[in-house]
Amino acid sequence: MPSISGQSSQHLAAKLLAHLCGFAPENLIDQLTSACTRFAEACADLTLGYDLLRRLDEQPNLAGQLSKCWIVSEFSLDHHCRDVKAFLSLIDSGDLHRSYYPLDDSLDQPLEKFLALNSDPSSSADNFSSVYQEQLHNKIDTELGGEKVGCEEVGDKVEEKLLPLLRCYRQREMQRIIWRDLNRLSNMQETTLDLSLLAGSCVDEALTVIHAHMAEQYGQPIGAES
C-alpha cells in the first residue's frame, strides 16, 4: 500500500483515472481527470481510496457507472468526496443496483397501484413507501430511540439530532436515486416515485418523532378541546 503523501494521492488519482477513462468521451477526459484528483485528495485515509479501486476490480459494471456519475453529477461527486466511507458503504449495501419498487414500462402502473391501495380499506398508501419508512424509522430508533426530551427541548433536539440524521439519510438516498437514474438502472416512473416517497417518508417520520415528544409533555389530544 502506498504511503500517505502528496505523491500517493497523485498515484491514487492516476489509478482511478486508468479504471474510469475508458468509459468517458474523449472531450470529457479532462473533467474526469479533475474528478479523480479531487476524490483522491479528499481521501484523508488513502486506504479508503484503494478500497474503492478494489471494488472497481471486483464489480465489472461499477467503473462505467462511476465514470458517468462523476462527470454528470456534481452533487454525487461532492458527497462521495465529503464522506468516502459512506460512499463505500452505499456500494457494499447493494442498494445502487436494487430497485425498492420494481415497476414495468406501463405508464399507468404506479397510478393503478396507488388507486388500488386507496380503494382498499384494509390497505394504506403508506405500504407503498414502506421501504423508506422502515429504513428511516430504524435509523431514528437506533440513534434517537433512547432519548427522552420535554416540550421545551424539542426545538433544540430537532436542530441538534433529528435534522442532521434526516439530512444524512436523504443525501444517501439521493445519491442512490441519481446513480440509478444516470445509469438507466431505473426508468422515469421509478425515479419520480422514489423521489416522492423519499420526501414523504422524511416528513412523516419527522412528524412522528416530534408528535411523540409533544404528546409525552402535554398528553395525546382526543377531542376538539383537549
Language-model-detected regions and their locations in the chain:
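Non-catalytic regulatory/linker segments of enzymes
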Residues: 1-226
